[in-house]
Amino acid sequence: MNKFWIMLSHTYKNKIMAKSFIISTVITVLLVLVVTNLESIISLFQGDDAKEKIAVVDETNELYPVFSKQLKAVDTDGDLDVKLSKQSEDEVTKQVKDESLDGMLIIKRDEKGTISGTYKALTISDESTYQTLQQALTQTKTAVGTAELGVSQETISSLYAPVTVGQKALKEGAKSEEELGQTVGLVYIMLFVIYFSVIMYASMIAMEVATEKSSRVMEILISSMPPIQQMFAKLLGIGLVGITQLAIIIGAGSLSLKLNQKSETASSVGGFLNLTDVSATTVIYAVIFFLLGYFLYATLAAFLGSVVSRIEDVQQTITPMTLLVVAGFMIAMFGLNAPDAGFITVTSFIPFFTPMIMFLRVGMLDIPFWQAAVGIGITLLTIVILAVIGARIYKGGVLIYGNSSAFKAIKQALRLAKN
């Protein structure tokens, strides 16, 4: 058992100190910091001249005051600096061409009273400015039309206000709208964490085994400790590497959100990922299914890596495993909108999909305990089977050198393990 801990510690330390780990962690942390501080970064580069200067040519000589009022309601961030111009259309157009102005809006009204507008700029690639002006002019049209008909603005506002429709689950024990809102953030997080963890760390395990095999170190290791101990020492070692990396990334993100609570980006992200009111049961299930997903695919990756003779062949060999993960993730993404769909229920009992899809159902629905227990049991049984078969393939596979298909290599590994 002492050798097990020595190998686990060796694997963990080697991976933690590796340049690839340090670089990937730093890059990911920087990306998280950029996302959580996006507003501050944008304002830093834009400065005080960030507002777009827009001139309005009001050919009606009466609509600009109403338009200006509606624009203030639409442009809540104050990104546009809009002013009425008394100059002619040609003169203002010249200013736009000279880049004294970013754009111009011409407001017209025909004989029938229909209000229209034309927006001019050097380029029309900035859809946000156009949409803001269009929305303000549309509201101007509504305000002017209703005023001429003698309808008050308050009446119009009440007519256009969206109808509030509450949701109430009638099934006993079903999750309420509030409970779903609280758990959806955790479900999203766990689906992505499981997906990326399996993709990254399972590939790392396969690469680790293939690397040691190519250096002939494996032959010495196999003779010094049981293959199943060796395999799980690597799985746990790299698993701890993953937990360390996730802890650093999540810690950096949480700290950044706390320091930028007033920013709109931080508040929206923090609101979506609000886990304070999530039930303890859901959190426990999240941990269980994360561990199951990791060990399931890590065990599979370990013995796939052991039958590879060249490091260059690792990605090709683990491609079927990667496709399984991608398929499970895509099904889970669809299931977020329809967690009670029949095929979601069926696929949640397929062990390679269970960690993601069963957790989705546990988080979004109030399923019977026996369904979650069966899913966990099937996955555990699959892990045990993969571990037993994998240990034999691992033992024989590390002694295989030469080019052959994965299927032939597995058969040869099982045959060597018996001898």
From Swiss-Prot:
Subcellular location: Cell membrane
UniProt key word Transmembrane: yes
Transmembrane segments: 16-36, 186-206, 235-255, 283-303, 318-338, 340-360, 369-389
Coiled-coil positions: none
GO molecular function: ABC-type transporter activity
Superkingdom of the source species: Bacteria
Topology term for the membrane: Multi-pass membrane protein
Keywords per UniProt: Cell membrane, Membrane, Transmembrane, Transmembrane helix
Cellular component GO terms, alphabetical: plasma membrane
The family this protein is said to belong to: To M.jannaschii MJ1024.
The protein's name: Uncharacterized protein YhaP
Organism: Bacillus subtilis (strain 168)
Classification lineage: Bacteria, Bacillati, Bacillota, Bacilli, Bacillales
Gene (UniProt): yhaP
